[in-house]
Design a protein with these regions (language model features):
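Positively charged n-region of N-terminal signal peptides that target proteins for export
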Residues: 1-4
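Bacterial N-terminal signal peptides
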Residues: 7-18
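Signal peptide processing junction and immediate N-terminal pro/mature segment
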Residues: 19-26
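Interaction/scaffold regions that mediate signaling and macromolecular assembly across diverse proteins
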Residues: 26-275
């Protein structure tokens, strides 16, 4: 029996190793047309206070500049506030709001759903080991949220709504995949009124953190794999990407402008757990 269990575990580990490289090719943005509608005359505001309450009580900033989340504590409490938030968001048709409110809505929903997904797999130490299917490499293709009569996956929200409809590269700094390598889960819920400032802050913070951009001991440029997976969301090619980053980095701009070496990409998929 132990040999069978060991063999199954080995097979799963091998499968994860085999399929993880596929993550280097992210889904292309392809608009889900039914969501490409907005009432830009609307001044109505979506209430994200329940999500803010979850962030206030369970998001833990760390000295290393990485925000971690107390998943186990939230699960032990029953996650009632998170559940109520997602239930409230499921009753809203975001198309009745202006574009900024919609974008904030989808980012918050994505992040809240991701937290909820992590709670379903308390023994897993990486989101890559989560998901409903036997050989899942993450929960991104699971149906995890329903709104306006449509069932959505996390990939739907990111690649069929946020990226193609709003066309803002900074969404990659806003959505959080529950991993150390990911841009921080923001401490303040996104809102239409503050969206521009919030996205700018998320971009600045990640770009200027070593997990976003750094030079190794040999002087080689190392970037987050986000810039590899979604490179054309930022620039037309790698050279233009480095120039794009040079314009935005607080201290390394001049060094980046003259850099002509290879670019290495890295990402830490460990769970961003505070426990």
């Amino acid at each position: 029996m132990n040999r069978i269990v060991f063999a199954l575990g080995l097979a799963l580990t091998s499968a994860l190793t085999l399929f993880t490289p596929a993550l280097s090719a992210a889904p292309a943005p392809e608009a889900w047309e039914i969501w490409d509608k907005a009432d830009n005359s609307s001044e109505a505001v979506i209430d994200h206070s329940l999500w803010q309450a979850v962030l206030d009580s369970h998001l833990k900033p760390s000295a290393d500049g990485i925000n971690r989340f107390a998943y186990k504590a939230l699960a032990a409490e029953g996650a009632d506030t998170l559940k109520r938030y997602l239930a409230a968001m499921a009753k809203i048709d975001p198309r009745n709001y202006n574009a900024a409110e919609q974008q904030a809505y989808w980012i918050n929903v994505y992040n809240a759903v991701t937290v909820n997904e992590v709670l379903k797999y308390p023994s897993k130490n990486s989101i890559l080991r989560m998901g409903e299917r036997f050989f899942s490499v993450g929960p991104w293709d699971d149906k995890v949220f329903e709104v306006a009569g449509e069932e959505l996956t996390l990939n739907d929200i990111e690649h069929r709504i946020l990226r193609p409809i709003f066309k803002d590269h900074r969404v990659h700094y806003a959505v959080n995949c529950a991993s150390i390598g990911c841009p921080n889960l923001g401490a303040v819920a996104f809102s239409g009124a503050e969206l521009e400032t919030q996205l700018a802050n998320q971009e600045r913070d990640y770009l200027n953190h070593p997990r976003g951009l750094t030079f190794d001991k040999k002087g080689r440029l190392q970037l987050s794999q986000i810039y590899e997976w979604y490179g054309t969301d930022f620039a037309e090619d790698e050279k233009a990407l480095v120039a794009h980053l040079a314009e935005r980095h607080a201290t390394l701009g001049d060094k980046l402008k003259t850099y002509t070496g290879d670019v290495n990409y890295d990402y830490d998929w460990d769970l961003n757990s505070a426990e």
